[in-house]
Amino acid sequence: MKASRFFIGTLKEAPADAEIVSHKLMVRAGMIRRVAGGIYNYLPVGLRSIRKVEAIVREEMNRAGAIELLMPAVQPAELWQESGRWEQYGPELLRFKDRKDNDFVIGPTHEEVVTDIARNQIKSYRQMPVNFYQIQTKFRDEIRPRFGVMRGREFIMKDAYSFDKDAAGLNESYRKMYDAYVRIFTRLGLEFRAVAADSGSIGGNFSHEFHVIADTGEDAIAYCPTSEFAANVEAAEALPLIAERAAPAEAMEKVATPGKAKCEAVAELLSIPLERTIKSIVLATDNEGAEPTIWLVMLRGDHDLNEIKVSKLPGLKNHRFATEQEIVEWFGTPPGYLGPVGTKKPVKVIADRTVANMSDFVVGANEVDYHIAGVNWGRDLPEPEVADVRNVKKGDPSPDGKGVIDICRGIEVGHVFQLGTKYSEAMGATFLDESGKPQPMLMGCYGVGITRILGAAIEQNFDDKGIIWPESIAPFEVVLCPMGYDRSDMVRETADKLYAELVAAGIDVILDDRGERPGVMFADWELIGVPHRLVIGERGLKEGKIEYQGRRDAEATLLPADTAAAAVAEKIRAALAH
């Protein structure tokens, strides 16, 4: 590719609405331009990287035995009504009517459409397992699109859907996709973690998210540096931090804590560790035609509630936070001084695992400006219902018993789910088993955010000059920067020869023949993030040398002119092989 025949739309300044590095750099590097909120044009530089991501994803999906097809972006409402997601999905689902007043949606995912294919085409267990995939544009009407391609409304996604006759088959399909994703993100040159996750709005029973590690990531990931354990913080099991409850050593005592409603303030006033205080959170579940059930969830003062874990407890699926009026009615005091001792009306108490093993702890006295110290289970309070209801935190024991938890930030770029029969039962996707009986198909679904990967890769690979692409997804692998291409025969002939050699070696190279000043050339290609640069100048050529600099290198080095192309090609092959 010659730069004079290519579109290079670099900018010196980022748009005012760009908040994070990837958004700023993708605009400045000429990769994207905004059309509307969360909707972008992908300019030639950006599209080249997209196509490289797609190629790696496609190769690994085919290698794993998945079969490519293409489903429509526009889907009839009837399919979504069958699955139940027409009502469940919410305003993110873009709905519209055609000229005949029929309801349609622009697909954010394709579970309904692919299940419709399966129920019409798969009749026997002999036709399974089968795994369909596509790479296609999706649309989710995000309430607040931001961060460029990281949270856009229109995006490119690879989605795959497996169909199996039994649980063993589903487990095998899931394993193949999990392994394929590991290969994909490894080949993309990204630092990532596969984490156990909650299934969210897609539904299902078992899932993993694939996160690119980046400080700007929206998701908190709990992982163990000395083992393979990793999980989304919302899904990670929190083990008790106290192995065994100690015997009471203090008498229960009501203490004045004027104006001290927070655990931190109470601990400071009483000169005790924060870990001896209890945080009381009041939840409610509504009962038709009767007053609500009130729940008191008790956490250690330095811990945070995990609502997803709470929602999975019996009776708490549809919980909400109690109103201040309800709190006063049940506890006799407004929030800030609540506790399980002497409530005004009966409440259901749930203690986190760590709280259940605590002794001599401090709780609210259900009276403004007072707490109760020296509280103990069994003596002062009945034994509670015990559950894991908190988020893990740094320093907690790892659930696999192989170390302690650390926390990092991640950007979700892939997700694999075991859906089971969620969609096949709702939509009547059945097959005849070995005995001729109809059975619901077992499904899995597997997504990769193609365009989101670009943003995530940049968040992990940049400096003050611009993007630093991994070789596998760089728009170009090498840029040739000739000094005086249009003025020096020696420079032009050498640059053209290098270009031909690199093309013949299968290297994705661009020759900058625009006639720009060196500073402009270097700034453009450093901003765009091309991993390797060769500078061809008369002074160096007279000594038989060409200047080489990798995008991550602090200094340039000199290579023999006659072997420079081969040397750079070998560097690229080594990087791609790694």
Swiss-Prot record:
<protein>
    <recommendedName>
        <fullName>Proline--tRNA ligase</fullName>
        <ecNumber>6.1.1.15</ecNumber>
    </recommendedName>
</protein>
<dbReference type="Pfam" id="PF04073">
    <property type="entry name" value="tRNA_edit"/>
</dbReference>
<dbReference type="InterPro" id="IPR007214">
    <property type="entry name" value="YbaK/aa-tRNA-synth-assoc-dom"/>
</dbReference>
<dbReference type="InterPro" id="IPR006195">
    <property type="entry name" value="aa-tRNA-synth_II"/>
</dbReference>
<dbReference type="GO" id="GO:0005829">
    <property type="term" value="C:cytosol"/>
</dbReference>
<dbReference type="InterPro" id="IPR033730">
    <property type="entry name" value="ProRS_core_prok"/>
</dbReference>
<dbReference type="GO" id="GO:0002161">
    <property type="term" value="F:aminoacyl-tRNA deacylase activity"/>
</dbReference>
<comment type="function">
    <text>Catalyzes the attachment of proline to tRNA(Pro) in a two-step reaction: proline is first activated by ATP to form Pro-AMP and then transferred to the acceptor end of tRNA(Pro). As ProRS can inadvertently accommodate and process non-cognate amino acids such as alanine and cysteine, to avoid such errors it has two additional distinct editing activities against alanine. One activity is designated as 'pretransfer' editing and involves the tRNA(Pro)-independent hydrolysis of activated Ala-AMP.</text>
</comment>
<dbReference type="InterPro" id="IPR002316">
    <property type="entry name" value="Pro-tRNA-ligase_IIa"/>
</dbReference>
<keyword id="KW-0436">Ligase</keyword>
<dbReference type="InterPro" id="IPR004500">
    <property type="entry name" value="Pro-tRNA-synth_IIa_bac-type"/>
</dbReference>
<keyword id="KW-0648">Protein biosynthesis</keyword>
<dbReference type="Pfam" id="PF03129">
    <property type="entry name" value="HGTP_anticodon"/>
</dbReference>
<comment type="similarity">
    <text>Belongs to the class-II aminoacyl-tRNA synthetase family. ProS type 1 subfamily.</text>
</comment>
<dbReference type="InterPro" id="IPR036754">
    <property type="entry name" value="YbaK/aa-tRNA-synt-asso_dom_sf"/>
</dbReference>
<dbReference type="Pfam" id="PF00587">
    <property type="entry name" value="tRNA-synt_2b"/>
</dbReference>
<keyword id="KW-0963">Cytoplasm</keyword>
<keyword id="KW-0547">Nucleotide-binding</keyword>
<dbReference type="InterPro" id="IPR044140">
    <property type="entry name" value="ProRS_anticodon_short"/>
</dbReference>
<keyword id="KW-0030">Aminoacyl-tRNA synthetase</keyword>
<comment type="subunit">
    <text>Homodimer.</text>
</comment>
<dbReference type="InterPro" id="IPR004154">
    <property type="entry name" value="Anticodon-bd"/>
</dbReference>
<dbReference type="GO" id="GO:0004827">
    <property type="term" value="F:proline-tRNA ligase activity"/>
</dbReference>
<keyword id="KW-0067">ATP-binding</keyword>
<dbReference type="InterPro" id="IPR050062">
    <property type="entry name" value="Pro-tRNA_synthetase"/>
</dbReference>
<dbReference type="InterPro" id="IPR036621">
    <property type="entry name" value="Anticodon-bd_dom_sf"/>
</dbReference>
<dbReference type="InterPro" id="IPR045864">
    <property type="entry name" value="aa-tRNA-synth_II/BPL/LPL"/>
</dbReference>
<dbReference type="InterPro" id="IPR002314">
    <property type="entry name" value="aa-tRNA-synt_IIb"/>
</dbReference>
<dbReference type="GO" id="GO:0005524">
    <property type="term" value="F:ATP binding"/>
</dbReference>
<dbReference type="InterPro" id="IPR023717">
    <property type="entry name" value="Pro-tRNA-Synthase_IIa_type1"/>
</dbReference>
<dbReference type="GO" id="GO:0006433">
    <property type="term" value="P:prolyl-tRNA aminoacylation"/>
</dbReference>
